[in-house]
A protein has these predicted regions:
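Gly/Ser/Thr/Pro-rich low-complexity, intrinsically disordered segments
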Residues: 21-253
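Sec-dependent N-terminal signal peptides of Gram-positive bacterial secreted proteins and lipoproteins
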Residues: 4-22
Length: 253
């Protein structure tokens, strides 16, 4: 009989404020604006100062509306470096017309994995450990900045352990438990001996403030990367990690 376990994600949000920065660009002496459609404008403002000379400021002005909505795009997988032109092509191939784009997060130049949180339509695409300031958008297109801290656990019976990272790179010598989905990529990219727990989602979703029920399909140890089956969830950790976590995963047969 395959074992069933529960995965729970809880979010902690705190409102934070933004203070206006000092005017250090100098005296404004020119600029232009271009209407891009869907209540969106592209602005250029030119400044000049005695200390640094001529400077240009570029920004997009967006009025929330139903024709243009902010989205997060990282291509077909979390793993992999891509430039903004590749992101634009990915959107066009999926029936979307981009108006403007910016880097949404710091990311690894080696892996392309964002260093913070990525959430789309409530689904946890990628999760970091600990809290961070986050930029979000409501369904009506309006934006906000809040402190975001998602705490995730996996439970088997009366015992639970923390899952610190979701769709992040599990590297050799790191202690915590990771959770990977097929959104991470085709393989786990692991380069050391790890314990892997392959699970099938039953009920619930990998969403903020929700519980997801999983059925354990297989538990094994392997040195290197493995394929991530489509639709499956993989729990894993380096075998040299925290013994309490290792014992928990190994008992999920």
């Amino acid at each position: 009989m395959r074992k069933k376990i529960l995965f729970f994600a809880m979010t902690l949000l705190l409102l934070t404020g933004i203070t206006a920065s000092a005017d250090v660009l100098g005296e404004q002496n020119g600029g232009w604006s271009t209407y891009m459609g869907a209540f969106t404008y592209f602005h250029n403002v030119q400044f000049n100062s005695d200390s640094v000379g001529k400077q240009n400021e570029y920004y997009v002005e967006y009025t929330p509306n139903e024709d243009a909505v902010p989205i997060v795009v990282n291509g077909a997988s979390i793993w992999g470096t891509r430039n903004i032109k590749q992101a634009e092509q990915y959107m066009q191939e999926n029936g979307l017309r981009p108006l403007a784009g910016i880097n949404a997060d710091y990311f690894s130049f080696k892996t392309g994995i964002p260093m913070g949180y990525t959430i789309a339509d409530g689904e946890i695409i990628s999760k970091e450990y600990g809290g961070q300031d986050a930029v979000g958008f409501r369904s009506d297109g309006t934006g906000f900045i809040k402190w975001l801290d998602i705490q995730t656990t996996v439970t088997d019976g009366e015992k639970s352990i923390d899952v610190m990272y979701i769709n992040k790179w599990c590297q050799a010598g790191f202690d915590p438990v990771y959770l990977l989905t097929d959104k991470f990529g085709k393989t786990t990219k692991t380069q050391s001996e790890c314990i892997f727990v392959i699970c099938t989602p039953n009920e619930g979703r990998l969403h903020v403030d929700e519980t997801m029920s999983l059925t354990v399909d297989d538990v094994f140890i392997y040195n290197g990367e493995i394929e991530i089956p489509e639709g499956k969830v993989v729990l894993l950790m380096d075998t040299s990690g925290v013994s309490e976590y290792y014992d928990f995963l190994s008992r999920l047969h």
